[in-house]
Amino acid sequence: MPIQILPPQLANQIAAGEVVERPASVVKELVENSLDAGATRIDIDIERGGAKLIRIRDNGGGIGKAELALALARHATSKISTLDDLEAIVSLGFRGEALASISSVSRLTMTSRPEGQAEAWQAYAEGREMAVMVKPSAHPVGTTVEVLDLFYNTPARRKFLRTEKTEFAHIDEVVRRIALARFDITLTLQHNGKTVRQYRAVKEGDARERRLGAICGPVFVQHALALTWRHDELAIHGWVAAPQAIRQIGELQYCYVNGRMMRDRLITHAIRQAYQDRLSDEMPPAYVLYLEIDPRQVDVNVHPAKHEVRFHQARLVHDFIYQAVVEVLQQAQVASAHDDPTPAISGAARDEEPRGVENRASAGENRFNRPASSPVASAPRPAHVAAPRMPAGDIFRRREGELYQRLLAANPAPAAETDSAFVAAPGAPVTVAGPPAVAVSTAAENGAPGDSFGRVLTLCADGVALTECRSGVALVSLFHARRCLLRAQLQPPDEGLKAQPLLVPLRLTLEAAERQALKTQQPLLQQMGLRLQPERQHALLHAVPLPLRQQNLPRLIPQMLRYLATASVCDAASLADWLAAHWHSADEAPWTVAQAVQLLADLERLCPQLVQSPPRALLQPLDLQPGVDRLRQEEQLNE
């Protein structure tokens, strides 16, 4: 058979094999076109599971008569025109294949009218050459696409369609995914003349939670942990389900990259890895997450149906998502470990009896939570949490057990000053409060703040917080506090620190002394959660403990090995102290009061001994009495 150019209809039918898998694929492509056209309302009519009719009507910008014929041509699009556009795609569609492919395997008509056009026009393609015919029609501003008798001319494809119920279930799932991607769009889905779904456009707040509950179910909303995380040009927000509620929620996984619904292995792996210590292998995590990334850093031109993407910095994206999910799960775990086991209540189902929430000491008193008329101070009532209790890990159980042993041995603190933990409801970032503070009778005498580091008043210099405690006011070094916290986090338990695998092993070039230290100190490195494999002049780094995930590992690990090669004492405590001292923040932005409150809360939880006897490098009490005396002297002189 000689080489020849395929007829347009046959070429489009071949392309349709990649783009049009089933009726749900048609719905996805057409609705994405409506979204790209700026529609705020989209009506979807389905008959017989999409095999008989798929009709998409929108109120978008519409298509002019001059361009209507081109809209059904292959490789015709208004969304990109240059290679630069292809490398920074911001629209959902860009290939210019969908309409041509769909029209080649169905009877497709498109009716459209833009704002500045007096009448509407209708286009349809027919014949072997797919010639486009245009005729006048009646239609409001917007576009309607009708797809009749899908796969009527490809019997083999039509034979592989499932039952009407199954095909409509796939369409319903596509509509759910789009409704989650765009809360500002009204979507209506009808099947055989009956309205099945109607998602009204909502703004921020409780209405957003109600729509989330309508799509994902009330159980997910009740156990959802709000997530917001940002690093440079990467940002992620959304909700992840508390691990103990996964069995009730079932399989629910929605992920979006720059507003595009996605099923990406890298993203799935990062989220699964974040849950690995909290879920069994057969239980998938539940989440609704939105990843925002510079369009130039992601290639969406990978799969014809645009289900997959390729990240230019895959490891960075993987670790970013992993860190964000791990952080929110750990914060919720710590918070719920100190709260009562009352089930969570979301914005969609509020508690019938509202309760105030007590702030931790460093955040200041919640003045609106005082009893209306009670002369005797009583202990604050525990607040409901947005995430149910999660079983703490071994390291948390042991350290919290030690803390409560100190509580039993110490004099009880006044009930009115007991702290309670609190986790924000879905839609707000998860925050963590500290545990009940340890009462120490001699703390105030020694200049320590008593049962906590006190309330953060302000930041008087970068890295220095001014706090108010029982004994007065004090300056707290946030840099030293962070070092103390990291040292505590890097102290390995009996079974060693948990090693967090890297997505891609890191190849490090080592000097002779560093290679020798790696060989002799392998047991210590294993205990610290560092998985280093010697390889001639190099070493492969496979895993690191969680506090080191965001570090510059190619620089830090060789420095650590040089330290081990020359150190006189090599044990876990000294190595943890060295790592804490050489830890560098990737974000050099100035400290905020919220960060100071969070840091001191974590330090009080993990290092209660520092609250009792703070080192001078951490806390410096301020003596305000000389200043007060001088003011009084000035007042007397002015009288």
UniProtKB/Swiss-Prot annotation:
Disulfide bridge partners, by residue number: none
Region (Disordered): 336-392
Assigned GO CC terms: mismatch repair complex
Keyword DNA-binding: no
Cross-referenced PROSITE patterns: DNA_MISMATCH_REPAIR_1 (PS00058)
Example GO BP: mismatch repair
Biased composition range(s): Basic and acidic residues: 349-358
Alphabetic keyword roster: DNA damage, DNA repair
NCBIfam families xref list: mutl, PRK00095.1-1
Family stated for the protein in its record: Belongs to the DNA mismatch repair MutL/HexB family.
Name used for this protein in its record: DNA mismatch repair protein MutL
Lineage summary: Bacteria, Pseudomonadati, Pseudomonadota, Gammaproteobacteria, Enterobacterales
